[in-house]
Amino acid sequence: MASSSCLKQGSVPMNNVCVTPEATYEAVVADPRLFMTSLERLHSLLGTKFMVPIIGGRDLDLHKLFVEVTSRGGINKILNERRWKEVTATFVFPPTATNASYVLRKYYFSLLNNYEQIYFFRSNGQIPPDSMQSPSARPCFIQGAIRPSQELQALTFTPQPKINTAEFLGGSLAGSNVVGVIDGKFESGYLVTVTIGSEQLKGVLYQLLPQNTVSYQTPQQSHGVLPNTLNISANPQGVAGGVTKRRRRRKKSEIKRRDPDHPKPNRSGYNFFFAEQHARLKPLHPGKDRDISRMIGELWNKLNEDEKLIYQGKAMEDKERYRTEMEDYREKKKNGQLISNAVPLQQRLPEQNVDMAEADLPIDEVEEDDEEGDSSGSSGESEPHDDQSIETDPELEEPSLNPSGPNLNPNPTEIVVAPKEKNGDVVMETSPLKKADEPTVAVTAEQN
């Protein structure tokens, strides 16, 4: 049977697309080859892409999908009655196809929805009631892309109110130039300043996406054309009405830390049972904490009342312990014995702030004196192997430490050994780090 088409470029309603079915509904159901031939020709006339989908490594049987859907009254009736699972159950998919139900529905709307309208309803002289009620329910063909309006109709939502800018500003500014400036950006849109004529407005530019709708993008929308759902609102509260807020996770720094001296909360009977079973099952099932928790919950539900009393008794003892410790904790806190937010004492060595005596001795004489190895008996200087030797190099000088631990004296002093002068005397000076008015003690040792 010959077919005719009145398809034109652009968005054309279904009533303006004249497609005569090549065969009856019973004929295409009985003959899969006739079905595939007529389906390919329909997509060719409409200018839409056609290809057999592959799910789980296998070609999808479009003929079977069409028969299963139309035998139940069509896709709209199935979705309204929520019987799509019946259609999915007739197919056998591999385990890797986890979203088979969604994929089947997606391919039906893109490949078989128009075929159903022409061969199933019009062949029988039936027009879907939804198509007669509103023109928006009719499928539209936009330059080779199908808009699945039937699926959008099945998903209902409440439209958000829009602000008519011309009515808001008055009819005198309807033809004025509009200049917009983006002041800031946030997760769901932009903060903008719009100048219309002599009026300046501040608001929010955001995209309204209802939670239960499926958005479809046409090629025209991908080339800088703003969708019709973009609104300029004079009230920033419009963002909350159109965009679902995300739940913000609190940072660790925002969580109030518990007092370390606070008693450990009491545990329930299940907590004791969980700790006991977790220690037993963890070596048997490494890396499966979630499964272990599920198994422990099942084991707890299988316990009788007498077995649970054992753990509930432990819980009562722990509750009494918590009550006693809390009373003691409150009493200490009341008397001021607890130091909250206590930190360990930070100790560090004092900074080096010493006055080095300058040596007038030439370099040659210093080297000669070093070779002689002269030392004074009163200074206690001995061989370098002795632990009590005094180094003469000021760069290797370190502060003296208390043998029993760090020196906590707030005004420590340091022993400074100056290089040998011409007369061979050793000058030892003690200079305070903080108090400048204390006397300086000098010890002079004459050379033997």
From Swiss-Prot:
All residue ranges annotated as the ARID domain in the record: 29-120
Entry superkingdom: Eukaryota
Low complexity composition bias: residue spans: 399-412
UniProt KW keywords: DNA-binding, Nucleus, Transcription, Transcription regulation
DNA-binding region(s), chain positions: 263-330
Compositionally biased spans, kind Acidic residues: 389-398
Pfam families: ARID, HMG_box
Tagged with keyword Transcription: yes
Keyword Transcription regulation: yes
Bias-annotated ranges (Basic residues): 244-255
Subcellular compartments: Nucleus
Region (Disordered): 219-270, 333-352, 366-448
GO cellular component: nucleus; pollen tube
GO molecular function: DNA-binding transcription factor activity; four-way junction DNA binding; transcription cis-regulatory region binding
Biological processes per GO annotation: glucosinolate metabolic process; pollen germination; pollen tube growth; regulation of DNA-templated transcription
Listed Polar residues bias regions: 219-236
SMART domains: ARID, BRIGHT, HMG
CDD domains linked: ARID_HMGB9-like, HMG-box_AtHMGB9-like
Family: Belongs to the HMGB family.
Biological role stated in the UniProt entry: Binds preferentially DNA with A/T-rich content.
Stated name of the protein: High mobility group B protein 15
Organism in which the protein naturally occurs: Arabidopsis thaliana (Mouse-ear cress)
Gene name for this UniProt entry: HMGB15
